[in-house]
């Protein structure tokens, strides 16, 4: 059955009147403006009666499609600039920096609706977390292509990516860096110092302040070690390196050092006197040292007994000399004779009834062969031989008077009846008696073991090979 064109136009008008009005719906962030429309996607069966009413020639069958921050590329069956006619298919895309949410392609349906919805959402990366001991600055917040540059606090070094860029997939490029404390602490030692040793000492007590230490990162110093003596220690002569090392929390370390120099003021080395020797305190030539002059057996000192090393590095006084001991036998008493030997010489008094006594001859012969050992031990021999009035007393070649001989015998209880001998120390005390001849070695052993002072013992060690 054929219908007239008028009838068709009336049916189309009725269809338009019966279709509900489409009110554009706008959602925040949808990408559509409030005065624009979009259609939800659904499947629609078009009745046969209505299908005959569809007209592809109507230019504006659906609402004009417009997507904010994006673009709709449409293809109409009519071609040309028809972008919303029935059957028009539009490809949806977003500007750079935006992501399409929804359908990529929609079509204008007979229901005058578009077959789906879509909008453009701005691409944003998540907010970057702050890093310990550091920060970052971004060129455009968290938006696409924004570059965030990291930096560390003073004293820290950045390890990892220095910059991160917000990419199109909404993720940041690279990885999260860290700030690492790699800078060592700052340490400053006290200045080097020099000090003179005190009088009669070879050391000096030196004090100093602790080093100045500061950490360039978090300010925390965990440990400071010292290599060398502590402040206030006694330092010997010479240069001494004092080293401090500081450690921070990250086990970085820094060291500094300074020098402690101790000087000893010294005088020129003294020479011992001829036929004598020196005993000195301390090192023997340092400031405050005292050197005493001593003479060998059979010699006596002429001049000052000691000299002192002064701060001017010169010795006080003048050196004495050792001269052969002069024994005055022309004295009025035995006491006057013995006083000349007090603290200077030991005495070995040999008494015999007559010069022909075999013990006497044997003893004198052995002693004459041991003059060196006797002199080293400061021993003077006095001989008392014979009977009055022919009795003889002598010290070396000097003769003693009969009165002195008699007093000596009485003081030391020496008989004329038989051979006897007495050993007297430097203080005038009877230390040993002999009734028979003894070898010089026996006498020397007794003196070395019991009568020598510490000074003389040291001297004996120095001279142990002298008489050999």
UniProtKB/Swiss-Prot annotation:
- Report keywords, A-Z: Angiogenesis, Cell adhesion, Cytoplasm, Disulfide bond, Glycoprotein, Proteoglycan, Repeat, Secreted, Signal, Sushi, Synapse
Write the protein's name. Answer: Sushi repeat-containing protein SRPX2
What one GO molecular function would you report for this record? identical protein binding
* Gene Ontology CC, one term: cell surface
What function is annotated for this protein? Acts as a ligand for the urokinase plasminogen activator surface receptor. Plays a role in angiogenesis by inducing endothelial cell migration and the formation of vascular network (cords). Involved in cellular migration and adhesion. Increases the phosphorylation levels of FAK. Interacts with and increases the mitogenic activity of HGF. Promotes synapse formation. Required for ultrasonic vocalizations.
Q: Which SUPFAM superfamilies match?
A: Complement control module/SCR domain
Q: Which CDD domains match?
A: CCP
Q: In which tissues is it expressed?
A: Expressed in angiogenic endothelial cells (at protein level).
Q: Which cysteines are joined by disulfide bonds?
A: 74-108, 94-120, 125-166, 152-179, 267-309, 295-322
Posttranslational modification: Contains chondroitin sulfate chains.
From the broadest rank down, the organism's phylogenetic lineage runs:
Eukaryota, Metazoa, Chordata, Craniata, Vertebrata
| Principal location | secreted
Residue limits of the Sushi domain? 72-122, 123-181, 265-324
Q: Which residues form the HYR domain?
A: 180-264
Q: Name any Gene Ontology BP term.
A: positive regulation of cell migration involved in sprouting angiogenesis
Q: Where is the signal peptide?
A: 1-25
Q: How does it assemble?
A: Forms homooligomers. Interacts with PLAUR (via the UPAR/Ly6 domains), ADAMTS4 and CTSB. Interacts with HGF; the interaction increases the mitogenic activity of HGF.
List locations, semicolon-separated.
Secreted; Cytoplasm; Cell surface; Synapse
The answer to whether the entry has keyword Signal is yes
Q: Which InterPro entries match?
A: DUF4174, HYR_dom, SRPX-like, Sushi/SCR/CCP_sf, Sushi_SCR_CCP_dom
């Amino acid at each position: 059955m054929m219908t007239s064109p008028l009838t068709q136009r009336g049916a189309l008008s009725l269809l338009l009147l019966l279709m509900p009005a489409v009110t554009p719906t706008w959602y925040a962030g949808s990408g559509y403006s409030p005065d624009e429309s979009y259609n939800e996607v659904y499947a629609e069966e078009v009745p046969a009666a209505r299908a005959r009413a569809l007209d592809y020639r109507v230019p504006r069958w659906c609402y004009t499609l417009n997507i904010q921050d994006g673009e709709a590329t449409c293809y109409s069956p009519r071609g040309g600039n028809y972008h919303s006619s029935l059957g028009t298919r539009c490809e949806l895309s977003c500007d750079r920096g935006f992501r399409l949410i929804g359908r990529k392609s929609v079509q204008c349906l007979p229901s005058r609706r578009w077959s789906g919805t879509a909008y453009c959402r701005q691409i944003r990366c998540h907010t970057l977390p702050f890093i310990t001991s550091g920060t970052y600055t971004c060129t455009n917040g968290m938006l696409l292509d924004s570059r965030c540059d990291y930096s560390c606090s003073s004293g820290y070094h950045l390890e990892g990516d220095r910059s991160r860029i917000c990419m199109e997939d909404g993720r940041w490029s690279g990885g999260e860096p860290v700030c690492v404390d790699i800078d060592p602490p700052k340490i400053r030692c006290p200045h080097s110092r020099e000090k003179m040793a005190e009088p009669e000492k070879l050391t000096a007590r030196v004090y100093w302040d602790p080093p100045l230490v500061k950490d360039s990162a978090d300010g925390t110093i965990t440990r400071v070690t010292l290599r060398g003596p502590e402040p206030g220690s006694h330092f010997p002569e010479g240069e001494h390196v004092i080293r401090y090392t500081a450690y921070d929390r990250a086990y970085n370390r820094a060291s500094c050092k300074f020098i402690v120099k101790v000087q000893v003021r010294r005088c020129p080395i003294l020479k011992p006197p001829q036929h004598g020797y020196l005993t000195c305190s301390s090192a023997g030539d340092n400031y405050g040292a005292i050197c005493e002059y001593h003479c060998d057996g059979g010699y006596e000192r002429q001049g000052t007994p000691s000299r002192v090393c002064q701060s001017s590095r010169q010795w006080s006084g003048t050196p004495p000399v050792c001269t052969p001991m002069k024994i005055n036998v022309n004295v009025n008493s035995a006491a006057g004779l013995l006083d000349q030997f007090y603290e200077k010489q030991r005495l070995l008094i040999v008494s015999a009834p007559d010069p022909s006594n075999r013990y006497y001859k044997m003893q004198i012969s052995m002693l004459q062969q041991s003059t060196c050992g006797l002199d080293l031990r400061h021993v003077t021999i006095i001989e008392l031989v014979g009977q009055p009035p022919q009795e003889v007393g002598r010290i070396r070649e000097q003769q003693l008077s009969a009165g002195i001989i008699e007093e000596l015998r009485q003081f030391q209880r020496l008989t004329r009846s038989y051979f006897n001998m007495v050993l007297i120390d430097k203080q005038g005390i009877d230390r040993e008696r002999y009734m028979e001849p003894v070898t010089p070695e026996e006498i020397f052993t007794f003196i070395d073991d019991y009568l020598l002072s510490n000074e003389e013992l040291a001297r004996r060690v120095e001279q142990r090979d002298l008489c050999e």
